[in-house]
Structures are given as structure tokens and as C-alpha cells.
Amino acid sequence: MDENKQRALAAALGQIEKQFGKGSIMRLGDTQTLDIESISTGSLSLDVALGIGGLPMGRIVEIFGPESSGKTTLTLSVIACAQAAGKTCAFIDAEHALDPIYAAKLGVNVDDLLVSQPDTGEQALEICDALVRSGAVDVIIVDSVAALTPKAEIEGEMGDSHVGLQARLMSQALRKLTANIKNANCLVVFINQIRMKIGVMFGNPETTTGGNALKFYSSVRLDIRRIGAIKEGDEVVGNETRVKVVKNKVAPPFRQAEFQILYGAGISKESELIDLGVKHKLLDKSGAWYSYNGDKIGQGKANSMKFLQENTTISAELEGKLRELLLSHAAATDAERAGAEREDNAAADDENF
């Protein structure tokens, strides 16, 4: 760029910062904008799949999946982790189905949790906007988009047609919310349901409710599915769960995580620690015995999980080592990939020149 253009650009940037405030425009390389604060999901493998150690603050996240796949359990786990870090959380229960006893079992401090059960979709989103603009709430869960019923639909007759009302409501609300969420550094998670598109012959017939706006405004979209049952004898005690990161604006997308959700207990952290510990050689497995730092911790996975539950110091130490190892490895892999892409692009530019 020649000298005159550089001076003109510097003057324009100075004018923008004077008018709209410092940080309103910047070069991407000037600051560590991608060092985004995150909140753990309660699942180590999902935190690693997300690339930054959890869900990003100051962003919109969508979690969708079939019924009984673990959507609400995952969001309650996020709330428990956020509260443990001293953050304030709110739960907008549009489905009117929040179970405080189950939430408490998952580690949520229900006494400090802000809960709203709005009558209409407009009311729910206005409450969400007010909480965001307060700057005092760090995590807001909206359960669910499908239950955000427009006021006109509630006041109308059963058979009335209300085409596109919910989609328009979501589009308008997200336009207002996005900038406020960024400025307040608040995490807003929308839970969504799956519907089937009629007449789809090829491709995926599944879609989510509430139109397309949420797909665009979300920085992270998680597809959660139940892939199997966990049994003790003939009794089913939990679900094997898979989460796919179908969209990610803060790290590479399309990574997957698998973990167990136990009924009445939530995400099984100990099961993940054992599986990942063995995989990355922090735990030794000899026959049925598991060992950590040369000391046997249990015979069989169930006994080893019980040991980690009872010995929280060892559990926290193992989790810290795994988190450091896996997240630094993910960051290094991303950096290598980005460097390779830059080299390829430079080579292509040279050839074109």
C-alpha cells in the first residue's frame, strides 16, 4: 500500500475509534482476539472437541437433537461448571419442564439459579435481552426454541394459520441480542428440537425449528444423539451419547465427542478420565487392573471409577494433566494446519503470478 493510502487509512481508523470507541475496529493480528474465555461443558472430551476448552463466552450457542438425547442435561452441566467458577446463571424455561431436584443432583446450585417461565416467546426473549444488557449474568439457557410461541398464536384459535411467525420473532430477537451478548461477554445457549422436512428424497430430511436465523447467528452448533444404552445386568442405567460440533467459529468444526450420561447423575466424568487416561498413557492397564503413577486404583472400570469418585484430589490431578495435554495438542494441530494452508496459498499465488 502506498504512503498516501496508509495515511488515509490511519485517519479513517482514528475517526472510527474516536466516534465509536476504542476497539470498534482493529487488525486481526493486533490483538489476541481468538483467546476466547470459555466455560467447561462438564465433559472433557467435548471440551477438547470444541477446541478452546468449552463453550465460548460472548457468543450464541445452539444445542439440538432428538427427544431424550441429553440436551437439557448438557446445559445443566454447563450451569454447574459456570457456578463452580463463580458465575451467575439464568434458565429461561419456555417448556415449563425444569426439574430442580434433577438439576441439584447434577451439581447445580438451585438457590442461586435465576429461573423464568415466560408465557410467550416475546416475553422470553425480552427477559433474555434484559438479563444480557444488565451485564451481571454470565450464562443464559433458553429451553427451548420450539416452545417460544408467538403471542399472536397463543391468543388465536387452535386451527388458525401462523406461517413464519416464530421464524420472524427469532430473526428480530437475534439481531438485537447479538451485539449486546458480545458487549456483555455473556454466553447464551439455545436448546432446539428436530423436525422432519416433508418430501425430501435425497439428503438429510432433519431440520431445526425457528427458521434459519439461529443457524447463522450461532458461533457453535452441537448435534447431540443417544447412540446406545448403559446396562447393569438387565437394568438400563444411562445412555451412551455422541456430540458432533457441526459449526464452530472459534476453532475447527466437525469434531466428535462420546461420553456417558448416567440417569440421576449426569455426565460421567470418571468414565471419561479412565478412557482418555488409558488412551494417552497417563493410566496403565494391566489385565483388569488400572494403575496411576504405579499405584493400583481398581480392578475393572467400575471399581476404578468408584476410586476416582472417592479420591477427588487424584481425579482433579488426572483431569488437569489430560486437559493440558489434549488442549495444547489440539492448538498445535490447528496451528500446523493453518501454517500448511498459508504455505499452499502462497505457493498458488506464486504460480498464478
From Swiss-Prot:
Keywords on record: ATP-binding, Cytoplasm, DNA damage, DNA recombination, DNA repair, DNA-binding, Nucleotide-binding, SOS response
GO BP of this protein: DNA recombination; DNA repair; SOS response
Pfam family, one: RecA_C
InterPro entries reported in the protein's UniProt record: AAA+_ATPase, DNA_recomb/repair_RecA, DNA_recomb/repair_RecA_CS, P-loop_NTPase, RecA-like_C, RecA-like_N, RecA_ATP-bd, RecA_C_sf
CDD domains associated with the record: RecA
GO CC, one annotated term: cytosol
Subcellular localization: Cytoplasm
Residues annotated as binding ATP: G65, P66, E67, S68, S69, G70, K71, T72
Primary location recorded for the protein, binned into one broad class: cytoplasm
A molecular function (GO) term: ATP hydrolysis activity
Biased composition (Basic and acidic residues): 334-345
PROSITE patterns in the record: RECA_1, RECA_2, RECA_3
Keyword DNA-binding in record: yes
Residue numbers spanned by region Disordered: 334-353
HAMAP family reported for this sequence: RecA
Primary role: Can catalyze the hydrolysis of ATP in the presence of single-stranded DNA, the ATP-dependent uptake of single-stranded DNA by duplex DNA, and the ATP-dependent hybridization of homologous single-stranded DNAs. It interacts with LexA causing its activation and leading to its autocatalytic cleavage.
PANTHER family for the chain: MITOCHONDRIAL DNA REPAIR PROTEIN RECA HOMOLOG-RELATED (PTHR45900:SF1), RECA (PTHR45900)
Family affiliation: Belongs to the RecA family.
Protein's recorded name: Protein RecA
Chain's gene name: recA
